[in-house]
Regions:
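Patatin-like phospholipase
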Residues: 2-6, 11-110, 114, 118-120, ...
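Conserved active-site and cofactor/substrate-binding residues in soluble primary-metabolism enzymes
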Residues: 15, 61, 111, 115-118, ...
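Short helix-terminating capping/connector loops at secondary-structure junctions
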Residues: 31-35, 132-139, 291-297
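Alpha-helical membrane-targeting segments
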Residues: 79-111, 115, 245, 252-264, ...
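C-terminal helical/tail subdomains of lipid-metabolizing enzymes
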Residues: 107, 115, 120, 280-377
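Active-site periphery "cap/insert" segments of enzyme catalytic domains
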Residues: 107-145, 154-156
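Active-site gating loop/helix substructures
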Residues: 134-223, 227-228, 233-259, 338-347
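C-terminal amphipathic alpha-helical segment
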Residues: 252-291
Length: 377
């Protein structure tokens, strides 16, 4: 059975995924090279996906190197944090309104993420992807981005010859040789980071318009899925006591981010569980009669944070660069004013990331029995 790894988006929250992967590596035998023949990443999840697939060596070594990156990560490694750079981009955004909203010379955005491009282009060995596919270590690696021209969710994948492109409602799979452009396109949060041009189209963050985040792995042949999310309330609807004031801009943006990066995954998981129940209940004779013999249950193991990421983010807002703290405070993203959810997507700070990695590690080890069952150990 082909095992697929699905890594969702979530900005700095994706540090949690690294902790889970580290925990899985500790549970698996040291000799395991790559336990996931099919790997899919979206947004910040694409960073982790390509960092695992685009490096040689045992899985434990790959996760250890990835952890080192996140442990030492600072905002300056991801986007320009100097006041001049932030003000310059803000001016470009405002100036674009004079030109009917178009960016002149380059795509408009509040932040310049060229440091991330440089870092990931140096770290991910894109040439190794072909080697891994050729030697059978990898069946497919995919990252998803949103097309600004069509509004489609486009999954760019590199895989073996048995995997055919697909075209469904508002989503398609395109076989291609992956590059740093595809990674940067998948992580380009609209408004925050610049759109990326690929061929004649511009692309943005893959979590936007990705209504079926689990489907790319299934299209590429996975029949067992391990999904690492970044929602801290999966399956729970906590009761709140209301608000004393109207929501701040940051709180509104936070809910919009959560809608893009979190809600679609939870909804797709719920749909998959319902399909699994239906597939398990249908006898073989009825499947053959209705020509749905390929409807089989998909084994799924989903791991998500057991603690509130928003609460952890609230403790680390003061670590952000001064220029960004000033900007966020104007939108209400403060420890007192709320909006820490929106800020958590930009909190590429060692203290915050390390806490998420530690939580991911604990959550994975707490599911050791489930993980061993998933890998048939």
């Amino acid at each position: 059975m082909s095992k697929g790894l699905v890594l969702t988006g979530g900005g700095a929250r994706a540090a949690y995924q690294v902790g889970v992967l580290k925990g899985i590596a500790r549970i698996l035998p040291r000799s395991v090279y790559n336990p996931f023949p099919i790997i899919c990443g979206t947004s910040a999840g694409a960073i982790n996906a390509l960092s695992i697939a685009g490096r040689a060596g045992p899985f434990r070594l790959r996760t250890s190197k990835l952890e080192r990156i996140w442990n030492e990560l600072t905002p300056a490694d991801v986007y320009r944090t100097d006041p001049r750079g932030v003000l310059k981009n803000t001016f470009h955004v405002l100036a674009s309104f004079v030109h009917s909203g178009y960016g002149i010379g380059k795509p408009i955005s509040l932040l310049d993420n060229s440091p991330l491009r440089k870092m990931m282009d140096n770290y991910v060995k894109f040439d190794y992807l072909d080697t891994a596919i050729s030697n059978g270590e990898l069946e497919a690696i995919a990252v998803t981005a949103m097309s600004y021209a069509s509004g489609q969710s486009v999954t760019f994948y590199q895989g073996n010859e048995t995997i055919a492109p697909w075209n469904r409602s508002r989503r398609r799979g395109e076989k291609i040789e992956l590059s740093i452009d595809h990674l940067m396109a998948s992580t380009a949060i609209p408004g925050l980071f610049p759109a990326v041009q690929i061929d004649r189209d511009y692309f943005g963050d893959g979590a936007v318009r990705q209504l079926k985040p689990i489907s790319p792995a299934l299209h590429m042949g996975a029949n067992k899925l391990l999904i690492i999310g970044v929602s801290d309330n999966a399956g729970r609807s906590p009761r709140v006591n209301g608000m004393e004031h109207s929501p701040s801009t940051a709180q509104i943006v936070g809910h919009m981010f959560n809608s893009a990066f979190i809600d679609a995954v939870e909804s797709d998981l719920e749909t998959l569980h319902n399909i699994n129940r239906l597939a398990s209940a249908l006898p073989q004779s009825l499947r053959e009669k209705n020509n749905i013999t390929d409807l089989n249950p998909i084994d799924v193991l989903a791991i998500s944070p057991t603690e509130s990421i928003d609460s952890i983010a609230q403790e680390h807002l003061h670590e952000l660069p001064r220029s960004l703290r000033l900007f966020l405070s104007l939108t209400g993203a403060t420890a007192q004013g709320g909006g820490s959810s929106a800020a958590s997507y930009l909190l590429f700070e060692p203290g915050f990331c390390r806490k998420l990695i530690d939580m991911g590690m604990r959550d994975a080890l707490a599911k050791e029995a489930d993980i061993k069952e998933f890998f048939e150990l």
